[in-house]
A protein has these predicted regions:
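Generic, well-ordered alpha-helical scaffold segments in large soluble proteins
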Residues: 84, 88-92, 121-125, 194-197, ...
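Flexible glycine/proline-enriched surface loops and loop-helix/loop-strand junctions
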Residues: 172-173, 214-215, 265-268, 297-302, ...
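Extended redox/cofactor-interaction regions of prokaryotic respiratory oxidoreductases
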Residues: 116-192, 199-204, 228-231, 319-430, ...
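Flexible, glycine/charged-enriched surface loops at secondary-structure junctions
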Residues: 96-100, 243-248, 295, 326-333, ...
């Protein structure tokens, strides 16, 4: 016991950013418990955090490059692996064009600071339009709504659940997930806190979920009818009359058009299709607009459906017209220590939509990516621009993308495939070469993305707990090497150096944030509750919110 040491870090296995207190001895984890000093999670953890120990100790985890041969998988050196990947990229692009090489980024990329900092330059170096990620099978409607309404793809409203009086949840199960595009560790307890202070939590879902069990009320809705439900709520609200002058009134564009659109969606007309009684719809609308503070939140169930984009747009409209947008207890916006929205926004890098289309199905791009639903057909369909090589980073699209069987057939047809992954799985088994990264406890970690989506502004750096084996490589080292092989240029900065440079642009000047200071405060630094700031963050050309 005397030799045991304590390490503090953030769990990076989901979006909740739970703080961990890890007891260890030498290179063995003794226990993992919640860090009560973490300003965001305050001691809460879920069972997933224990998997960090399992991942570190897993004998099946790859640590050295492997190559598929006629005699099975064989270990090879990093030099041989990089040489082969470089040769194949250059050969295939020279023969078939840049777009013959496709990439896919799985969700773990945004949970790893190395991938976030070095992945972009690698993708750019390939000069291909055939880029894909989990985004189009997940949260794309959120980004499109934010881009079109507020002018920036990452300006995503965050429900202020710790100060709201009324929480309306559609197609989300934060009781199990602890929030998605809403980083809120300990979400079930926060639901109970709303109720304890006299508030209500209404859950609209075709299923009775973990969230339904602890909500004030659960109502079943017919699948895919969420847009009708939201239009009907707005019909009632406009019929009742909204407060014409709010702090956002001078920034709104399109309010009269919205009023006209929703006139046709009376609950009496739509209730049967929605599957919720018209009186219930009216009551929810009136309660929402009459609550001191209220916020509507919708996630996967309203995003991954035919009307996903419409749903996320209408959720924003509902929060805006009831004077609950950019307001304490409503939908708010973060100001993280490393403020990606501000840093990219002032450079005009706010996101893009429909600049070009996919080759086979004529589907629009989003910020340089095409929908993953068309990836298999882009490989299988012959002709100019056909994908011949595929680079998959921390993803398993055979399981996670639409039509996994077709994806398998497509991967079998490739001339060459590379997986950057720690496991031999349903997708990586089709690769010619697998480049494994370090993982979890072997890595430096700072959440660049999820601080942008959290219910409180905090900053926390997790140092490496266990040094990697001599033959292992971090994700940033792999991506940096591949970029150099293609461009001849190598980024000389380490992740710590890059983070320090980014902290120099932090708006929290008084906090004097740096990698060194965060290392001195391993449980994290509290930067305060969310504050109204949208009017200073609108990136549309006319500085209006296009509702």
């Amino acid at each position: 016991m005397l030799d045991n040491k304590i390490h503090y870090r953030t769990c990076n296995l989901c979006e909740a950013m739970c703080g961990l207190e890890i007891t260890y001895k030498e290179k063995k984890v003794i226990s993992i418990v919640g860090d009560k000093k973490d300003p965001l999670s305050k001691g809460f953890i879920c069972p997933k955090s224990l998997a960090l120990k399992d991942l570190y100790e897993d004998p099946d985890r790859l640590k050295t490059p492997i190559k598929r041969t006629e005699n099975g998988w064989q270990e090879i050196s990093w030099t041989e692996a990089f040489d082969e990947v470089e040769i194949q990229i250059k050969k295939i692009q020279e023969k078939y064009g840049n777009n013959a090489v496709a990439t896919y980024q799985g969700n773990p990329n945004v949970h790893n600071v190395g991938s976030m900092l070095y992945g972009g330059p690698f993708l750019k170096s390939l000069k291909t339009k055939q880029k894909y990620s989990a985004t189009s099978a997940d949260q794309l409607p959120h980004h499109i709504a934010s881009l079109k309404m507020f002018g920036h793809q990452m300006l995503i409203p965050i429900p202020d659940i710790e100060r709201t009086d009324y929480l309306l949840i559609l197609g989300a199960n934060p009781g199990a997930s602890n929030g998605s595009l809403l980083t809120a560790p300990g979400f079930p307890q926060k639901i109970k806190s709303i109720q304890k202070r006299g508030g209500k939590v209404i859950n609209i879902d075709p299923r009775f979920t973990e969230t339904s069990k602890i909500s004030s009320q659960h109502l079943y809705i017919n699948p895919g009818k969420d847009a009708l439900f939201l239009l009907s709520l707005l019909h009632v609200i406009f019929d009742q009359g909204i407060e014409e002058k709010t702090h956002l009134s001078n920034y709104l564009k399109g309010l009269e058009e919205i009023k006209e659109i929703v006139k046709e969606y009376s609950p009496k007309k739509t209730a049967l299709l929605i599957g919720i009684d018209s009186l219930e719809i009216q009551k929810i609308a009136k309660d929402f607009m009459n609550s001191k503070t209220a916020v509507c939140y919708g996630r996967m169930g309203v995003s991954t459906q035919e009307y996903g984009g419409i749903c996320q747009w209408l959720i924003n409209v509902l929060n805006i017209v009831t004077n609950n947008m950019d307001k304490v207890g409503g939908a708010m916006f973060t100001k993280p220590a490393i403020d990606l929205v501000y840093m990219t926004g002032i450079q005009g890098k706010v996101g893009n939509f429909d600049r070009y289309r996919s080759r086979v199905h004529n589907l629009p791009e989003y910020s340089g990516e095409l929908p993953v639903a068309t990836l298999a057909d882009e490989i299988l369909t012959e002709g100019d621009g056909q994908i011949k090589m595929f680079i998959c980073t921390a993803g398993n699209p055979v399981l996670s993308a639409p039509n996994g069987k077709k994806m398998e057939k497509a991967l079998e047809k490739l001339d060459f495939m590379v997986s950057i992954d720690i496991y031999l799985n349903e997708t990586s088994k089709y690769a010619n070469i697998i480049l494994p990264t370090t993982n979890g406890l072997e890595t430096l970690h700072y959440d660049l993305v999820f601080h942008q989506l959290a219910i409180r502004n905090t900053a926390k750096l997790s140092e490496i707990l266990f040094e990697k084996d001599e033959n292992q490589k971090h994700d940033w080292q792999i991506l940096n090497e591949l970029t150099e092989r293609i461009t001849g240029k190598k980024n000389p900065l380490t992740p710590e150096m890059m983070l320090d440079n980014m902290f120099k642009f932090s708006s929290y000047k008084a906090a004097n944030l740096s990698v060194k200071k965060l290392k001195e405060n391993p449980s994290g630094i509290d930067l305060g509750a969310l504050q109204p700031l949208l009017t200073k963050r609108i990136f549309t050309q006319d500085k209006k919110i296009n509702i």
